[in-house]
């Protein structure tokens, strides 16, 4: 059976390495795209709509990447996520801030199948808290939300039009490109779903938790293609997603058909309808006498179906030695010796 998850992973891998669609030498280089995005970021800073991070203020205009994970096509460039997008983490207000009706408050259980499912255990906060204490994490339609506390990491979803305003908790960050938002959000979702960058920066905490900090999120290394190539990548990935979804459905249909067929065959078998009866066959009662001369035959009358002529019913103990096992103490377990099977090994 085809592994659709591995197939999609391969598509994403090709996409982020610049191998899914051909490069066009006539495309405007990604370096020009990056400068246009930076210019928009500066405009937003001057207008007071966003703040310049302390790290960005100290950085030079030319980023240096000593540890880039792979080589890019000539027309691509590396950048940090915060070079092209506003990145902010959420937080959890006091219990008194939650209300029955108010501003939708997204929790990580609402990120289901890479979409926002706010109908699942919805929670709301007051307008005052949304526009006050939690104003930095106010979402907009089209923002990308990524969880930063796992396992699992890699839950990503785009804020839908059904949530014109919302907020979220501290287990996630929002990603809002400064320019070309729709196309870059789609591209960033493809890149981050590939998981290699997320896995490379994740740190393991207590009790098996896996985390990414806000700073790590802002500094994630992003390979940027030319804008036209970004569009081609998104279009190609979308085509493959449709194909993979169709394959998944076909596989599910086949599995359901196999399960139904197996059940039907077993049903026919136990009702004596799978193969024809032969009147010359020795009756089943003679077989039981040879297995256990002391067997007790059962009355067939309580069965909901007619037992074929030549068949007979009996209890399991008449033809099998049925025994139960005992629990083994932990001190009795050995690395070698007689195999001991538990229910989970069957």
What is each PLM-predicted segment?
Residues 1-25, 31-32, 42, 50, ...:
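Short amphipathic coiled-coil heptad-repeat segments
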Residues 10, 19, 64-91, 227, ...:
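Non-catalytic DNA-recognition/assembly elements of restriction-modification systems
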Residues 16, 76-77, 184, 188, ...:
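Amphipathic alpha-helical segments
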Residues 46, 63, 77-116, 130-134, ...:
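Low-complexity, Lys/Gly-biased intrinsically disordered segments
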Residues 92-93, 112-125, 144-147, 151-168, ...:
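Short, ligand-facing micro-motifs at secondary-structure edges
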Residues 97, 104, 191-222:
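Specificity-determining recognition surfaces
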Residues 139-140:
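Short, well-ordered loop/turn sites that connect or cap secondary structure elements
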Residues 152, 165-173, 186, 205-225:
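A short glycine-rich beta-alpha junction/loop motif
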